[in-house]
Amino acid sequence: MRWTAIAVTAPTQEAANEVCSTLPSALQESTVLLAVPDATSLKVGSGAATLNALLTVAEELSARAGFSTLSAEPLRDARVLVLHSGASARGGSPNPCLPQALTSLPTVGTVPGETEAVSMAEWAVRTASRLFDDMPPGLVVCSTDSLLLIPSTVALQPDVLREVAGAVVAVPQSLEVAVEHGVCAPAAAGSDLLGSIVYRGSREQLATLASPDGTYPVRQGAVVARGW
């Protein structure tokens, strides 16, 4: 995947810069890497952070394309990745003073000659790059707070986004995990179209959402949207 731009969001400029510093080995030279702090000191959600990141990306790409004002033209063929990083690590982290995005994983880079450990943020970039390798121009939003482990043979099929505007990534989980997270509910029985996401639903609410093998499609921190 050749990303046009990658925007890293964080509560502060310093935190965003630190996460960006772990990413160069996962990028192509042509990728524009942007550190985007939250627009306010108040706590903001991922939706507001995404909008702020998209504005920053649009401004940067417009300027690089020679526009003196904000223009959507540079986005038409752009593939943009937004990475959300939180303020601090979750409980149990081996690095409690660091954002979760900077947590080192027990693995090394896959680039020949590379020996440095991979951070959660870099893992998110590499996973998104492989998973959405054939996507058309559009937007991918990923969290760096969870470790998404997907078989190397799994990837988004190009024809999927020709039929729908976007898609979410969900993985099968047990009921014990599902009741603590968001479970994808289909628009209709047997449909692959997303109707809603049931967040921290009761066992009774989730009873009808179980797959034939008894697992539940739990939403992970990755969303893809086609076109601009």
Would you name each region that the model predicts?
Residues M1-W228:
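Unchanged
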